[in-house]
From Swiss-Prot:
Binding positions (Fe(II)-heme a): 64, 380
Membrane-spanning segments: 18-38, 59-79, 103-123, 149-169, 193-213, 246-266, 269-289, 312-332, 340-360, 375-395, 414-434, 447-467
Main location: mitochondrion
Family, similarity comment: Belongs to the heme-copper respiratory oxidase family.
Protein name: Cytochrome c oxidase subunit 1
GO CC annotation: mitochondrial inner membrane; respiratory chain complex IV
UniProt xrefs under Pfam families: COX1
GO biological process, alphabetically ordered: aerobic respiration; oxidative phosphorylation; respiratory electron transport chain
Keyword Electron transport: yes
Membrane topology annotation: Multi-pass membrane protein
A Gene Ontology molecular function term of the record: metal ion binding
Catalysis: reaction(s): 4 Fe(II)-[cytochrome c] + O2 + 8 H(+)(in) = 4 Fe(III)-[cytochrome c] + 2 H2O + 4 H(+)(out)
Residue stretches in coiled coil: none
Length: 527
């Protein structure tokens, strides 16, 4: 990091991927700090650390959600992993639009600053990440905080749209000779399947929050029934974006998991084509289920029946992926190195999150469970243990390629077990709280809920210890790990991997390929 000009103006996909990773790590640390503050407040009944300031509690909730989704998971998963891996995996010299790639990243820091500054303006933005009116309207949040948060969303949305255009163009036009789509690794497939929903859904969000902005500042009434508007319109528009948005971090994660499970089982992925079509199905179906977040707003019974059925159908391609991973492991000689531990943890916990999703898909049950901690537990099992475990797995899998050094295996495994124990202890009790009717976004609760909340808060402290261990692993690897030569890549040579990233030096040269590789072999594993 000695030359700031190189990092500011770089158009190299590896440099920009590294910037995305660093940015994601910083945002992730901030988001984790907010989540620990939330859990400290909820550790016991009554007012604990926020002095009874319920608005501040909701500002923390809002900032935690935005930081984790828009500034940690998405930049690290799509910007970081995508930028580093996709050009190498398809045999391309770089991304299709390198300068667009640069601005895609540099739109994010100002966006983050706008979000953080919104918390410091007057009483902050305590709307939740959904920013639903009338709570986000000018009468309920009169200062500039919500406007600042909306501007932040606009900027990060532009960043994602530009990045998506870049990835789609790169993968469709810049594959090396012989690298057909059906020879591409599954991570390469997962990126355009992620980019298309982003490209289609973000403009809808932009429209919705622009309406909100004009309602707040220019006296329009899109969300105000007094002027002929409807707050439910905003909910439909937001959720049309918001539901594909929650699949967006998971799909590249599932691509990473496919690589890892294949490598450490010593077998090609079971049902490659099925995996591809399952990913595409999830990407398409994600657009058809948004109103399952809105079962309590007074939808027609036939509308609720449709959204219940459509939501349950998403479980089918998801199940295909889960069972294909299990079938890949079946009969393989499995090595439980750190990436594989995270991959198996991902499969197990993502499955639990999916099962609670099936419960919540029932519109009748959701009337009781909506906005309780059951929903919080569900989406954290999918995101906190799906997307984040996939990121950890991918980091340990490719870190040798990125740094040219091996990570300390024992410390990596300790990191896994502490984190696994911590997140489960945090989130599993939330199912019981939700079934008992404890509502979300409220910083105080009756004494009856005290036991499970105390356990949950204790689990969050353990998770922080695990995440600190991760940064220890990163520091040791980047500064003093064993150098990797082509002969001692930890697992690529053992498993005779034929994805392209293992065939270039570690770390890859500034310009990865002297000449474009010609792909003649379609098998992903040779015994």
């Amino acid at each position: 990091m000695t030359n700031p000009v190189r990092w500011l103006f770089s158009t190299n996909h590896k440099d920009i991927g590294t910037l995305y990773f660093i940015f994601g790590a910083i945002a992730g640390v901030m988001g984790t700090c907010f989540s620990v503050l939330i859990r400290m407040e909820l550790a016991r009944p009554g007012d604990q650390i926020l002095g009874g300031n319920h608005q501040l509690y909701n500002v923390l909730i809002t900032a935690h959600a935005f930081l984790m989704i828009f500034f940690m998971v998405m930049p690290a998963m799509i910007g970081g992993s995508g930028n580093w891996s996709v050009p190498i995996l398809i045999g391309a010299p770089d991304m299709a639009f390198p300068r667009l790639n640069n601005i895609s990243f540099w739109l994010l820091p100002p966006s983050l600053l706008l979000l953080l500054s919104s918390a410091l303006v007057e009483v902050g933005s305590g709307t939740g990440w959904t920013v639903y009116p009338p709570l986000s309207g000018i009468t309920s949040h009169s200062g500039g905080a919500v406007d600042s948060a909306i501007s932040s969303l606009h900027l990060s949305g532009v960043s994602s749209i530009l990045g998506s255009i870049n990835f789609i163009t790169t993968i469709s036009n810049m594959r090396g000779p012989g690298m057909t789509m059906h020879r591409s690794p599954l991570f390469v497939w997962s990126v355009p399947v992620t980019a298309f929903p982003l490209l289609l859904s973000l403009p809808v969000l932009a429209g919705a929050i622009t309406m909100l902005l004009t309602d707040r500042n220019f006296n329009t009434t899109f969300s105000d029934p007094a002027g002929g508007g409807d707050p439910i319109l905003y909910q439909h528009l937001f959720r049309f974006f918001g539901h594909p948005e929650v699949y967006i971090p998971i799909l590249p994660g599932s691509g990473i998991i496919s690589h890892i499970v294949s490598t450490f089982s010593g077998k090609p992925v079971f049902g490659y084509l099925g995996m591809v079509y399952a990913m595409i199905s999830i990407g398409v179906l994600g657009f058809l289920v948004w109103a399952h977040h809105m079962f309590t707003v007074g939808l027609d019974v036939d509308t609720r029946a449709y959204f219940t059925a459509a939501t349950m159908i998403i479980a089918v391609p998801t199940g295909i992926k889960i069972f294909s991973w299990i079938a890949t492991m079946w009969g393989g000689s499995i090595q439980y190195k750190t990436p594989m531990l995270f991959a198996v943890g991902f499969i197990f916990l993502f499955t639990i999150g999916g099962l609670t999703g099936i419960v919540l898909a029932n519109s009748g049950l959701d009337i009781a469970l909506h906005d309780t901690y059951y929903v919080v537990a569900h989406f954290h099992y999918v995101l906190s243990m799906g997307a984040v475990f996939a990121l950890f797995a991918g980091f340990h899998y490719w870190v040798g390629k990125i740094f040219g050094r091996t990570y300390p295996e024992t410390l990596g495994q300790i990191h896994f077990w502490i984190t696994f124990f911590g997140v489960n202890l945090t989130l599993f009790p939330m199912h019981f709280l939700g079934l008992s009717g404890m509502p979300r976004r409220i910083p105080d609760y009756p004494d009856a809920y005290a036991g499970w909340n105390a356990l949950s808060s204790f689990g969050s402290y353990i998770s922080v210890v695990g995440i600190r261990r991760f940064f220890v692993v990163v520091t040791i690897t980047s500064s003093s790990g064993n150098n990797i030569t082509r002969a001692n890549i930890p697992w690529a040579v053992e498993q005779n991997s034929t994805t392209l990233e293992w065939l270039v030096q570690s770390p890859p040269a500034f310009h990865t390929f002297g000449e474009l590789p010609a792909i003649k072999e379609t098998k992903s594993y040779v015994k």
